[in-house]
């Protein structure tokens, strides 16, 4: 099996002009759609697909202004209690807009929608549609149903709530994705089957289901043809991908990476979010074999204490995690590592936290998504006794974030004098002679160059550190277009 099977006929290098920008409008005669996205990159991807879907089916175009929208959609996150309460706070503001414009349609999707269902309408009865992550492709039909029953008496109206977990069918009904620059997210699987004791994802997005291999490769090949040069593969447990092949076999995540790397035009590969249990030797080998793999990895560990990991039901030890990172850094010594940390998990002792803090220092993390533990209803951890005072949890969190911030500063400073491979993305807003791009480690890199280089990769020597995430440099080599 080769990747050529999945590349559209006539695929070729795309010029800068093939990359379309987001469609926004101020024309009052055009139907307008506003989407608020909360949470993870999966939600970002889903929101883009909602816009594609309603644009294709009903002619809606995106607006940045909710006050001028005909439809307001909220793509929600339930990973933490604060995020969930933010949903109803924002809906309260949207209620005022609906009072001013009774024809305004309000829809709630994402994980809070999946978790709460029609309870959302009980608390916010002005919400017209509720849909889950796996049913967003049914939005056009739900919208039609809404308009068809607008004039009906309230008692005759059907509640428009669809939060089911059908087989991974939504991708069969989504239009071709719109391209917005030289980077793109591609969702390759949905859900998670790990059932960590703190996590709502298996309950809000369902069990792990992988997209068929040919669907994934065809989407990526189509994006490459339109000028996309960097692909980020998405999934709640992305390295657990097990996609069915057209021959009836199963493609693993490392095998998928190797096939994607063969697609003309794709010069850089990222992925998120992964689980340590399935961060295999085969996956690590891809970092040695595939130059498209970036030297940046987000691998959530959640805690540096084995006792806490056991309570979290992570099913691995700290030594397992350390061993995998050691193997990876033997291949890529410059690997930048980020992770997730939950601080103040029920039962976390001072000793447990000290272990976590030392672990963070030892592994030299570049970045983290770190939060104080938030109890989520229906999860096993919600029944655990929690005796740690909130102020102690916040103090611990501050220590973690300070250690990681200092490590990040040091890693940025260490870039001085080094050569970075940069994807050139745009002209600077401040100076038309300055180009802006992204390094493997996600830092923004600016340098003097020509706008015709946009969309290509370049080797840049870093000459000045400006901020934590911004560096200056000089061009050493402009790579040919990778298409």
From Swiss-Prot:
Record-annotated Radical SAM core domain positions: 178-410
Enzymatic class: transferase
Residues annotated as domain MTTase N-terminal: 31-148
GO cellular component: cytosol
Residues annotated to bind [4Fe-4S] cluster 1: 40, 77, 111
Predominant location category: cytoplasm
InterPro entries reported for this sequence: Elp3/MiaA/NifB-like_rSAM, Methylthiotransferase, Methylthiotransferase_CS, Methylthiotransferase_N, Methylthiotransferase_N_sf, MiaB_methiolase, rSAM, rSAM_horseshoe
Keywords attached to this entry: 4Fe-4S, Cytoplasm, Iron, Iron-sulfur, Metal-binding, S-adenosyl-L-methionine, Transferase, tRNA processing
Stored Pfam families: Radical_SAM (PF04055), TRAM (PF01938), UPF0004 (PF00919)
Subcellular location: Cytoplasm
Reaction(s) the record says it catalyses: N(6)-dimethylallyladenosine(37) in tRNA + (sulfur carrier)-SH + AH2 + 2 S-adenosyl-L-methionine = 2-methylsulfanyl-N(6)-dimethylallyladenosine(37) in tRNA + (sulfur carrier)-H + 5'-deoxyadenosine + L-methionine + A + S-adenosyl-L-homocysteine + 2 H(+)
Residues engaged in binding [4Fe-4S] cluster 2: 192, 196, 199
Entry's cofactor comment: Binds 2 [4Fe-4S] clusters. One cluster is coordinated with 3 cysteines and an exchangeable S-adenosyl-L-methionine.
Residue ranges annotated for the TRAM domain, each copy included: 413-477
Required cofactor names: [4Fe-4S] cluster
One annotated GO molecular function: N6-isopentenyladenosine methylthiotransferase activity
EC number: 2.8.4.3
NCBIfam families per the UniProt record, alphabetical: miaB-methiolase, MiaB/RimO family radical SAM methylthiotransferase
Family: Belongs to the methylthiotransferase family. MiaB subfamily.
Function: Catalyzes the methylthiolation of N6-(dimethylallyl)adenosine (i(6)A), leading to the formation of 2-methylthio-N6-(dimethylallyl)adenosine (ms(2)i(6)A) at position 37 in tRNAs that read codons beginning with uridine.
Subunit structure: Monomer.
PANTHER family: CDK5 REGULATORY SUBUNIT-ASSOCIATED PROTEIN 1 (PTHR43020), MITOCHONDRIAL TRNA METHYLTHIOTRANSFERASE CDK5RAP1 (PTHR43020:SF2)
Protein's recorded name: tRNA-2-methylthio-N(6)-dimethylallyladenosine synthase
Native source species: Acinetobacter baumannii (strain ACICU)
